[in-house]
Amino acid sequence: MAFANLRKVLISDSLDPCCRKILQDGGLQVVEKQNLSKEELIAELQDCEGLIVRSATKVTADVINAAEKLQVVGRAGTGVDNVDLEAATRKGILVMNTPNGNSLSAAELTCGMIMCLARQIPQATASMKDGKWERKKFMGTELNGKTLGILGLGRIGREVATRMQSFGMKTIGYDPIISPEVSASFGVQQLPLEEIWPLCDFITVHTPLLPSTTGLLNDNTFAQCKKGVRVVNCARGGIVDEGALLRALQSGQCAGAALDVFTEEPPRDRALVDHENVISCPHLGASTKEAQSRCGEEIAVQFVDMVKGKSLTGVVNAQALTSAFSPHTKPWIGLAEALGTLMRAWAGSPKGTIQVITQGTSLKNAGNCLSPAVIVGLLKEASKQADVNLVNAKLLVKEAGLNVTTSHSPAAPGEQGFGECLLAVALAGAPYQAVGLVQGTTPVLQGLNGAVFRPEVPLRRDLPLLLFRTQTSDPAMPPTMMGLLAEAGVRLLSYQTSLVSDGETWHVMGIPSLLPSLEAWKQHVTEAFQFHF
């Protein structure tokens, strides 16, 4: 699934020259313009399908909605706070980041902050520059034997843990996603948050800024902490409540804080920055030559690999699209879209609940990536959106009055005469169920409402299909249908029938293009519909 029409990319922030070179070597046109106003950014994007930014460019809803050609936004770094994800997703624009690019640099800065807090190195340096010699004022504390609480145990959190363990620190932590067994493998004991607060001598945060993490350290949690706790935030401004932190510093509950990020950057309120026990930097977490080179290289490689259909990594807002690049999953994504398109043509404008059912071991976890593809098939002809795709499908489906559920059946190979893996799409409470599978790399239709096709019907993007159901006992039906095709001037490209089910047979005809009307057909058959996905 290559983004074949992605041809031109705007780089709107300063990036390593390797980024431009990799993009150009991959066949993409590149424009580099920095310090653009919103209006200038919108103007530049009118001719670009791709945009690569760092943190300076703000990709707002206004920018996204005005950029008619934009398909992909790449963030050369981890956080995507400067990209309106909801607006991008709604418009079907893919958002990517480079989650590994600045991890080491951010981890090293965090470790440096911890050491500076322990020994007050920046304050002592400032004192020396003032011509003073204040040995007693800057009494520090050893890290050996102290407890470090790490909130967020992803790439950066675990790098911090392994480094600070070398200083003899005990590392405990919390992460709602990483299992205790995994964190134990890199030396971090996971505990509930309420047990972490009173144990820590130092606390460092490494979570994204979410509603659940905003103000994670606040007046209440500071009150539960050990008196004299030291806090580090090199993640995102807002995770630590800045007002609560200032109050904790003023009361002595917090002995020191090291901040690389702020709720507002640069901060207009200088109370924290100016506090004598606060060490601060102007958001330098990724500001190393190595990180900048790595992030620029990684985002460029991700763009080129995506365009060439090789792989898709670093996706922030479309798990299904990532799966669509897997050699195993790609044909199943195509099958899911085909069955969704079939279901819409068959059931009209379905309302209620669409059931997406997978069967077979290799599809055990595929429902969440196949259901968006089913939605694309259901909505692409009916949505008022210019483009329904795997990025925005789940966001748009509820607006269409549909609920989509997924379920899985671990059926044994050969059960019911089917292959090991199947995908079924059904309309709950209505007589509409289509079943398909993948043969080699070809999606095929296996059955409709229990009527099985032998052999299965290939589902190809270049072959419109006409489907109709008839009474099996009518010998005049085939010549009648051929006559209707002849009257319409349409050639028959393929023809298959199902096994008899409840005295009726399904017929599938491959035709060069969809017929203008099926009224003449419906006079001779039980039901008829056509589709092309």
Curated annotation (Swiss-Prot):
Keyword S-adenosyl-L-methionine among UniProt keywords: no
Cross-link (Glycyl lysine isopeptide (Lys-Gly) (interchain with G-Cter in SUMO1)): 21
Coiled coil: none
Enzyme class of the recorded protein, top EC level: oxidoreductase
Active site residues according to the UniProt entry: 236, 265, 283 (proton donor)
InterPro entries: ASB_dom_sf, D-isomer_2_OHA_DH_cat_dom, D-isomer_DH_CS, D-isomer_DH_CS1, D-isomer_DH_NAD-bd, NAD(P)-bd_dom_sf, PGDH, PGDH_ASB_dom
Keyword set includes Amino-acid biosynthesis: yes
Pathway assignment: Amino-acid biosynthesis; L-serine biosynthesis; L-serine from 3-phospho-D-glycerate: step 1/3
Cross-link (Glycyl lysine isopeptide (Lys-Gly) (interchain with G-Cter in SUMO2)): 21
Residues modified to N6-acetyllysine: 21, 58
Record keywords: Acetylation, Amino-acid biosynthesis, Isopeptide bond, NAD, Oxidoreductase, Phosphoprotein, Serine biosynthesis, Ubl conjugation
Quaternary structure annotation from Swiss-Prot or TrEMBL: Homotetramer.
Primary role: Catalyzes the reversible oxidation of 3-phospho-D-glycerate to 3-phosphonooxypyruvate, the first step of the phosphorylated L-serine biosynthesis pathway. Also catalyzes the reversible oxidation of 2-hydroxyglutarate to 2-oxoglutarate and the reversible oxidation of (S)-malate to oxaloacetate.
Name of the protein in question: D-3-phosphoglycerate dehydrogenase
Name of the gene encoding the protein in the UniProt record: PHGDH
